[in-house]
């Protein structure tokens, strides 16, 4: 299946609005005082979850493209990755400003003594580096080093999942689900399930077996 430029533009606009919707709902709930008894915790939880969801969606683009043969999916990956960074940054700002009141002493102690905060901060730094180098101009300047740098998105995904698992104290169902999705994406990347899913999809949709699309080099950008 191919998509023309007009369809891609419309898709990007829709994706932009969809990715922005969680923030709008979050701010609306904050204004309406509907964040519950602990609004700061609610802001942290919801922003962090959306950062992880969008990061996993970014990682899922390449497997979906390989299974379906829909090369146009790659055109949306950079936006997903940048939104993942945006929500991760929002999550961190809420922690710095509302949770810790910009008390750098407390923040330093947290980074040293709370491993889940340290690993979450590491994930944010990786996403920051990827977002800062996501433009085509930087891609051309860095060359092969750019490709190697953007492979770190998988480490960011792993650190984010561990951050969530480490944070939860009792109910592991939701972070466990995200961990399972990440594991499946990594298994696909290693080629253990790619061929079977690809064959089933193409047989079902009667797609040609030799259909190939050029591979993009980035996980957070086109």
Where do the protein language model's features map onto the residues?
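Membrane-embedded alpha-helical bundles that constitute the cytochrome b-like, heme-associated redox core
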Residues: 1-222
